[in-house]
Amino acid sequence: MTHSPDLKGSSFTLSVLHLSDNEIANTVEFLQEKVSQAPSFFASAPLVINIAKVQGDIDFPALKQGIADAGFIPVGITGSKDKRVQNLASEAGFAIMSASKSPSQAPAKMAPTKVVRTPVRSGQQIYAKDGDLVVLAHVSAGAEVIADGSIHIHGTLRGRAIAGASGQQEARIICHDLQAELVSIAGDYWLSDQIESEYWQKKVMISKAEESLHLEVLAI
């Protein structure tokens, strides 16, 4: 029996780079710095470019090459309804994308919570598909914990925590001691140098609202 290809719709969480100007060199330098800070997270990651705030023309071929040279995979642009701009981007090999009008929701049927009782060592990756993740120990630097739902860490988070991996905007990250290399919820992320000192080494809850991460120190 011959099986033919099947084309179906789906959704993915992609990193979005919001440009404020058309200075390609500055953009490439910024991306290179991000890759050097968290290479296992950013290297060969697909990237969408939001150009809504850019005034003036963009050298799209140079932008695409710069993104690739920095270690990302340029996917498409969003944020412009100007047909001339869209045509220039398309000619350079960018897809023309539009943001979804409704946020991704949790799966209709969540999987049971995945519980990890041992420390997550450097180089390990734990993934809770379609559900929440609970780690009853520490997450070491160089380790990665991922969940389509929320993540609870009953120890120190020194590695990377990625919640809402399938786009769930309501996901949370809760940890007893925040020293993370990276935290991410539904595609929005902060690196360690973006986390303010008032939250460092504290018990915190991280949530997402209005396309930005929010941190709250927990008293309990």
UniProtKB/Swiss-Prot annotation:
Name of the molecule in the record: Probable septum site-determining protein MinC
Family assignment from sequence similarity: Belongs to the MinC family.
Keywords tagged on the record: Cell cycle, Cell division, Septation
Job description of the protein: Cell division inhibitor that blocks the formation of polar Z ring septums. Rapidly oscillates between the poles of the cell to destabilize FtsZ filaments that have formed before they mature into polar Z rings. Prevents FtsZ polymerization.
Highest taxon, organism lineage: Bacteria
Subunit and partners: Interacts with MinD and FtsZ.
Disulfide bonds: none
Gene Ontology biological process: cell morphogenesis; division septum assembly; regulation of cell division; regulation of cell septum assembly
Pfam families recorded: MinC_C, MinC_N
